[in-house]
Amino acid sequence: MADKVCCPGPICGSNNNAAGGGFREAVCVHTKKVYDSCRSKECLRDIRVFLCRDAQELLNAGGIASVKPRSAELLCVKIDVERVQFNRGFYTVDIRFFYRIECEVSCVIGRPRIIDGLAVFDKRVILFGGEGGARIFSSRFIEDDTDIQLCPDSNKPTAVVEVVDPILLDARIVSPDTSCNCCCCALHEVPRSICSCFGGGHLVVSGDESQVFV
C-alpha cells in the first residue's frame, strides 16, 4: 500500500484525510505580526538642498539666470523606534528621508551646468506595537555536538517603511538674508554612507551663503 502524502495547504478534510490536500494536525509557525500601519501622501515644499563645495561656489559667484529641477532620488531612510511613555503598547517612529536632488543651473554667460545636493525630510508617526515583553532564545542545530546558542531576541516592534521616489516640481535660489536659517532647515550631521553618494565631498551646511530650495 502506498504511503499517505500530506501536501502543504490549509487544514481541511475529515477523518484525518490527508489526501484532500490538508494537514492531519495543525503546524506552529514562528512569524512576525503586523500590529499597526499608516499611509500618507506628502507634498513637500521649502526643503533646502545642501550642495557640494564646487556647486556652492558656483552659486556664490553670482550670474545665475535660473535654476530648473531635474530629478529626485531617495538614497536612504533612517528609522528610530521609541516607546511612548504612559501609553502602553504605543511607539513613536521617527523617519528621516535622505534625497539626492539634481538641478540645472543656467548662467548668464556660458552653458548650463548640472548640480546636485542632499535634501532631508523628517516625519514622525505613533503606532501600536503590542504589549508583549517576551524574550526569545534559539539555537542552531549541530549534529553530534553542542548546538550553537544564538543571541537572545525579544518581541519588540520592528518598523518597516515603504516609499517611492518623489517627483520634483520646482526649484529656486534663495539669498542668505531672505532664508529663515531656523532649525527646520538645519542639518547637523550627515552619515558617512550618504556623503559617499556625493563622491565623499564636503556638503555645505552653513546658512550664510546662497541656498537652493525645492
Please identify what each model-predicted range represents:
Residues M1-V214:
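Viral structural modules
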